């Protein structure tokens, strides 16, 4: 039986202490639409963060996973659930793929694996994604996955010297099931 954390292109796994070097490259990618300029960090701070993530005890519904390729075992990004409303049955997630690894289907597959777990195993009813309006790649990705724009917070985020709209997108479990099937293939 195949792992529910493994697809054709990617495998989702725990973050390991040795992953710190890859995260320094992802953080240096200021070219991502929507990435906020960050203060420079030391290599030691990335080592400490990766070590902390490796031993973190998630609450079951909020967690971050490494995304690595199945072909080469190369770390290409992260995906995770970071906010939940367990009473109402919703969760919010994020996905980050390093610049050298974009447009290869890694984000698509990582998100499908995450959503399948959250809908099937954790019994959530709705998934939320929040995207800066000028991040066309993420808007297109979520649209292809079946998310629907549910709202827009106008000029809600200040970034790079001006205010930007924030797009709220959602997908219900039954919508996901029709497109991707909740039970793994």
Residue ranges of each PLM-predicted region?
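GNAT-family acyltransferases
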Residues: 1-100, 163-164, 168-185
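Conserved hydrophobic/aromatic "anchor" residues
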Residues: 15, 65, 117-119, 147
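Conserved G/P- and acidic residue-centered "switch" motifs that form tight phosphate/ATP-binding loops
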Residues: 73, 105, 135, 161
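Short amphipathic helical patch at the helix-1/turn junction of helix-turn-helix
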Residues: 97, 132-133
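Conserved acetyl-CoA-binding loop-helix of GNAT-fold acetyltransferases
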Residues: 103-117, 136-144
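Structural motif
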Residues: 121-124, 144-145
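Conserved catalytic-core motifs of GNAT/GCN5-like acyltransferases
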Residues: 128-131, 148-165
